[in-house]
C-alpha cells in the first residue's frame, strides 16, 4: 500500500476533454509535502509515514516540535498527517512528494472536513418532508414530528435523526478520477467535488476499491531535499537508487 499525500484545496474549475465536453474538476495543490518521520513496528507497533505540508512560523511551533523538524531537516509544517504503508513503501525522511505520485486516469479517495452549516433543522439536515402546510398545523411546518413510541419503549432512541449541528465532519469521497497533473506547479485536478472549504487541507490516497494502475510509481514519486529534479520510482527504473524503502 502506497502513501497518500496532503494537499490544499484551491477551488473548482472546469477543463475540456478530447470530445469537447467540459468536466468539472477540483484543483488540489501540493505545497512542499515532505516526509517528516517514520513509524515502525519495532518502535510504534505499526508502519506509517508522517507527512507535513505548508510553512509554519517558527514562533508558533513548540520547542518539542521544532526538535522533531530539526531531526528530519525540514522546515516547520502547518499540517501533519500519518499514512499507513507497507514497510517496502517507506520513503526517505525529508523527501518531497510530487504531483506525479499519481497518474492521469487513476481513481483516488479524498478525505477532508465538510463545510460547517451551524445548527440546522431536520428538513435541511436529514431531508425530512416536514408537516402539512395547512389543516391543523400551526407554527410547526418544518418540525420533525414524533420522536418515539408510547409507554413502550418510553424513550427516544440514540441516533434518532433530529435537528442539530450540521457539517464540520470528517468526510471521505471515494473514486474520484485524476483528470490532469501539473508537475511544475504541484497541481492535481480531480473530477467532481471534494469535501471542505477552499484553502482547507485534504488527504488524497489511492482508491481502496479500485485497482492501482500498472504505471503508478512504486513506492512513489518524490524529489530529495537538495535535488531540483524528481527522483524516479522503482517502477520507472529498477536500477535507480532514488526511490528506496
UniProtKB/Swiss-Prot annotation:
InterPro entries per the UniProt record, alphabetical: Ribosomal_uL3 (IPR000597), Ribosomal_uL3_bac/org-type (IPR019927), Ribosomal_uL3_CS (IPR019926), Transl_B-barrel_sf (IPR009000)
Listed PANTHER family: 50S RIBOSOMAL PROTEIN L3, LARGE RIBOSOMAL SUBUNIT PROTEIN UL3C
Disordered: region residues: 214-245
Biased composition (Low complexity): 225-245
GO cellular component, one term: cytosolic large ribosomal subunit
Domain of life: Bacteria
Family under the similarity heading: Belongs to the universal ribosomal protein uL3 family.
Subunit structure of this chain's protein: Part of the 50S ribosomal subunit. Forms a cluster with proteins L14 and L19.
GO biological process: translation
Family matches, as Pfam families: Ribosomal_L3 (PF00297)
A GO molecular-function descriptor: structural constituent of ribosome
Protein name, as recorded: Large ribosomal subunit protein uL3
Function field: One of the primary rRNA binding proteins, it binds directly near the 3'-end of the 23S rRNA, where it nucleates assembly of the 50S subunit.
UniProt PTM: Methylated by PrmB.
Keywords of this entry: Methylation, Ribonucleoprotein, Ribosomal protein, RNA-binding, rRNA-binding
Residues with the N5-methylglutamine modification: 151
